């Protein structure tokens, strides 16, 4: 590639050499990005199969593909115990952040529209505030992204509709509730 400088590595392969590097720590120091923390949650999932046999699995431990799928389906069930606890913890975190950043917002990414609506109901119950819900088949949902981005409401719930390339700088807490 023209204008690219290459250097040989220890194995004799040529690697491109950057003229300038700018990483996350530089951007954080410059104040152009916010700090990112990933909170890990664990828990035990219990379910019954079609034959009525009860199963249990601990999230985060080695499982078969089928056990993993069933455990996540159980854990992400809005009517279960785990998601309400995760959402409540996320809201506690967001409320703490809003003491210093009053317009900080949170987002829940759901696996489907049914789950998104159910998570929105949970948020309404937990916070007393109706979240912004964005579903691809709802008229005006794209406008809601802009409204949420420019507003001060606390929570946004979407089904993979808000992703890379969508800029909502005030988002500070996220719950990725999909497998």
What kind of region is each of these model predictions?
Residues 110-135:
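Conserved helicase motor "Helicase C" RecA-like lobe of SF1/SF2 P-loop NTPases
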Residues 2-12, 123-126, 172-175:
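Short secondary-structure boundary/capping segments
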Residues 2-103:
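Interdomain helical connector at the RecA1-RecA2 junction of SF1/SF2 helicase-like NTPases
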Residues 17-19, 32-36, 127-130, 169-173:
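Short glycine-/polar-rich loops that comprise or flank the Walker A/P-loop
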Residues 82-92, 115, 143-144, 161:
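Well-ordered alpha-helical segments embedded in enzymatic catalytic cores
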Residues 2-5, 42-47, 113-115, 138-139, ...:
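Conserved nucleotide-binding/hydrolysis micro-motifs of P-loop NTPases
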Residues 130-179:
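Conserved RecA-like P-loop NTPase helicase motor core
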């Amino acid at each position: 590639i023209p204008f690219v400088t290459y250097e040989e590595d220890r194995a004799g392969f040529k690697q491109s050499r950057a003229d300038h590097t700018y990483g996350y720590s530089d951007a954080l120091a410059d104040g152009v990005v916010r700090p990112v923390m990933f909170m890990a949650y664990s828990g035990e999932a219990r379910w019954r199969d079609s034959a009525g046999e009860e199963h249990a699995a601990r999230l985060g431990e080695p499982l078969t593909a089928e056990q993993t799928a069933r455990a996540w389906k159980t854990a992400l069930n809005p009517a279960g115990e785990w998601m309400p606890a995760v959402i409540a913890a996320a809201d506690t975190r967001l409320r703490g952040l809003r003491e210093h950043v009053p317009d900080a917002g949170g987002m829940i990414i759901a696996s489907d529209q049914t789950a998104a609506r159910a998570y929105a109901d949970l948020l309404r119950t937990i916070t007393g505030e109706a979240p912004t819900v964005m579903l691809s088949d709802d008229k005006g949902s794209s406008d809601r992204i802009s409204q949420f981005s420019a507003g001060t409401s606390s929570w946004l719930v979407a089904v993979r509709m808000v992703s890379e390339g969508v800029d909502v700088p005030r988002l500070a807490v996220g719950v990725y509730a999909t497998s």
